[in-house]
Amino acid sequence: MLLSSCNGKSTINDDNNGDTITFKYAEHITAVRHDGYVDVKLSNPWKSGTILHRYALINRSDSGKVIPPSDATVIYTPIRRAIVTTSPHCRLLFDLGAGEAIKGVCDLAYITQQDVLQRAAKGTITNCGNSMSPTIERIIALAPDAMFLSPFEGSSHAQLENIGTPIIECADYMETSALGRAEWMRFYAMLIGKENTADSLFTTIEHNYNTIVEHNKKQKNHPKVLTERVTSGVWYCPGGNSSMAKLIKDAGGDYIFADDTHSGSLNLSPEMVISKAINADIWLFIYYGDRPLTRNQLNTEYSGYKTIKAFKDGNIYECNGKTSTYFEEISFRPDFLLTELTHMFYSQNNKLRYYKRIQE
């Protein structure tokens, strides 16, 4: 380890490789541990070969002792005051035992986690408004150590950066495997001082997931699977290289767009999807509503649905995002969703965690 002294502080020689922290599944994180400093680089999932964000994670006890690289955002760990803009990351922090660090959230109306709702009602968590345009005054008042948010291609955080708020770019959703996305919990754990907890939890998730995959490889039948439904004239389906498509495969299903190479969402015409889905054995989708949907409602919504085999056979499964914990859990507990899909594909189990079979 090569260190040089500058005004009593140590600066780390970037030419030294340090100790690499291995990520087994996540493709967009590299981390190197130095003495009192962890250098984390998030690769840009939208532009190969470039860096989305670089962080210097410095333990609070070493504050002032290290001069980080000039292109790195400094995060003093463990984070004590965080604003979290997505429900999955709220849930993760609670699962890792760091829920008390959450001082603000965005899009409170879409959060179903009781811990967050109760604290928001008491005023110990502040609603910072819409995640796409958060209320700057509330953020300033909270004086967070960092703000967790999900980036998108071409997104800018200039307004937040101008007020000095360190941004944690939660690009985990761009991973192409479910375990790759879940493994980001190990990065987030570095920020909150819960590395051992995250390592233990991820080991459990990995074991559960891979055990189910090995079991499903023995299945001889592979039901054809259709996902989602028409929205404003467009049928949005997961790309064939998405984590959802791979989950379906790992559960033993044959996703109708498995041969597609996109990792993001496909924006398709209803007619095109129907032509591929006419023989689909299972149809599952997510919606927001106050009550369960019926087949009659679906038929009224779009008459083409009734030509799908799964519609005729009654193998339609709905997940109500308004009341389910689906969005809060599945990002970092893919083993839960894999178990659910396996039950749907093979056991016709009606006691499911997220989905319900449409009865009418």
What are these regions (language model features)?
Residues 207-296:
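Flexible, glycine-rich surface segments
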Residues 126-152, 165, 270-284:
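Proline-aspartate-enriched helix->loop->beta-strand connector
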Residues 6-90, 197-226, 312, 325, ...:
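Bacterial Sec-exported substrate-binding components of ABC uptake systems
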Residues 89, 94, 105-115, 155-157, ...:
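Extracytoplasmic ligand-binding site segments that recognize negatively charged/polar headgroups
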Residues 72, 77-81, 92, 124-130, ...:
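Second-shell loop/turn segments in exported
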Residues 1-4:
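Sec-dependent bacterial lipoprotein signal peptides
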Residues 179-204, 285-360:
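Structured C-terminal subdomain patch of bacterial secreted/periplasmic proteins
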Residues 46-140, 147-149:
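A short, structured surface patch at a secondary-structure boundary
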